[in-house]
Amino acid sequence: MKILCAVLALILSTMLPAQAQTTSLPGGAKIAGLAGQRDLIQEEKNRALVVEFYTEVLSHRRVDLADKYLSADYIQHNPYAATGREAFVAFFTDLFRRYPQSEHRIIRTATDGNLVYLHVFARNDPNDRGRAVVDILRVDNGKIVEHWDVVQPIPETSANTNGMF
């Protein structure tokens, strides 16, 4: 009975209107939260688009397909990469040239409205311990329009045995 109630609560929670919230950050930046109901079918379409993009363009190194997935005015928040689809192509063309054995592997995904979250294992070559990456991509009208990421090197030793994935 407890499981049935928990499942029912989860289903109903996706049908309730989300509360709009605004969060202020240092420097005056504001982040608007969700407003309205979640569209789980659209969220799944967005997730599938982002996973296909990541697999084709990053894992298979097909930067020539960027225009299929990225808007022309793609917004980049990574401080080491410029904004725009053409800048994305230039950045990853150079990265793949410098690191021909680099690896980008999706471990898990999640969605929230028009945002898709990826938890990724990435490394430049087989001898590299790698990095744990969280990519956040915003999708609008079937195109990826914005990207944020957080990158953490995988340490040689850890205070626990849980691993990063």
Predicted regions and their residues:
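Short beta-strand edge/turn micro-motifs at domain boundaries
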Residues: 133-163
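Short, surface-exposed coil-to-beta transition loops
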Residues: 102-104, 129-134
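Short, low-complexity N-terminal intrinsically disordered segments enriched in polar/charged residues
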Residues: 20-68, 161-165
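Short, solvent-exposed coil/turn segments at beta-strand boundaries
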Residues: 66-69, 111-115, 137-145
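A solvent-exposed, acidic/Ser-Thr-rich amphipathic alpha-helical stretch
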Residues: 63-112
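Short loop/turn motifs at secondary-structure junctions and domain boundaries
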Residues: 52, 99-100, 126-129
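Short beta-strand segments that buttress and anchor functional surface loops
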Residues: 118-125
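Bacterial N-terminal signal peptides
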Residues: 5-15
